[in-house]
Structures are given as structure tokens and as C-alpha cells.
């Protein structure tokens, strides 16, 4: 008697609302797309997109990175986003604009950049 195998289709999750965490530092930009619980759906960074050195923290690199994440999010079924921005880098606004241009609806833009209440002493100024 032959055994028959049945293959089940993988359960492809279809999300509607997601969160885009944009971490923009002076050296790089990292964008992570999560669902409401915080499980990672997709991520990308300027270094992953092929930018090297000081080109990683440019608005253009942020735009390309955000477009890559938005494409993956649209494939996962995300239509609406909450954007959480962290850090002082140059590509923050360009990344948000790129997400809007990919026909994603932004619900909230929240800035959670950590600001010290006179915490540690900063490093000395560079003399060039």
C-alpha cells in the first residue's frame, strides 16, 4: 500500500497595520517594519542596500532603504503605518517621504529620540 503525502500551504500572514521603526544615526539608517505585537516583518539598512562609508547617512540612502522596506511591507499586506523615528541622522524626513510615496497611509509619526536631562558629559569638540 502506497503512502500519500499531502502538502499544506504555508500560512501567509496578511497584516493590515504595521509599525515602521526608523533609527537614524550619524553613520547609518536602519528601518524595521513590525506588526502591532512587535514581530519583525521586514528590515533594511543603508549598508544592506550597498552604500559604504559616509554615503550611508545621506537622504538618498534613506529613501532607497525606505522604498525597499515599503515594497516588502506591501507584499505582506500592510496598508497603514505608524512611524516611530529615533535618532538625529540626516535621512529621517527622506525615509518618511519615501514611505508616503509608496502609497502607504501614515497614521501617526512619533519621535522618540532620547534626550538627556543633563546626563553624561559629552566628548570634547573636534579640532580640525
Swiss-Prot record:
GO CC annotation: ribonucleoprotein complex; ribosome
Annotated coiled-coil segments of the chain: none
GO molecular function: rRNA binding; structural constituent of ribosome
First and last residue of the signal peptide: none
Keywords attached to this entry: Ribonucleoprotein, Ribosomal protein, RNA-binding, rRNA-binding
Biological processes per GO annotation: translation
Role played: Located on the platform of the 30S subunit, it bridges several disparate RNA helices of the 16S rRNA. Forms part of the Shine-Dalgarno cleft in the 70S ribosome.
Homology family: Belongs to the universal ribosomal protein uS11 family.
Subunit structure: Part of the 30S ribosomal subunit. Interacts with proteins S7 and S18. Binds to IF-3.
Name of this chain's protein: Small ribosomal subunit protein uS11
Species this protein is from: Karelsulcia muelleri (strain GWSS) (Sulcia muelleri)
Encoding gene per record: rpsK
